[in-house]
Amino acid sequence: MKTVQLGTISVIHETWLPYAAACLISYCNKIPEIKSQYKFNEPLYKYKPVEDYTDKFKDIDVFGLTCYVWNQAYNDQLMSHYKDINPQGITMYGGPNVPEDPKLAEQFAKEHPYIDIF
């Protein structure tokens, strides 16, 4: 069974609920084929120093974050750190700060080599 970690981390709000990540997890847990192959951790939502996630990253197979202008720099640090700890893990970015235009996406991929899927 693969372990999946999703999240929307706030760097500006003390209290933040990861609604989008929770909705994705809830949806996936209703599909037997997904539920039998993937275990979803509680979504990440609290800002912590990147190093505080080191132990958690060792046990995660798939890591996905929602990217906004206000959390992009922190997410970049977090994803890069995850790949250092778990180079075989799969990383995903989604959200409004991920480019859809093919030319911008190509540049984004070059600037974010630690992101596998966006």
PLM regions and their residue ranges:
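Hydrophobic alpha-helical membrane-insertion signals
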Residues: Q5, W16, E33-Q37
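Short catalytic helix/loop segments, enriched in acidic residues and glycine
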Residues: A20-K30
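Glycine-rich beta-alpha loop elements in corrinoid/cobalamin-binding modules
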Residues: K2, Y27, S36-F118
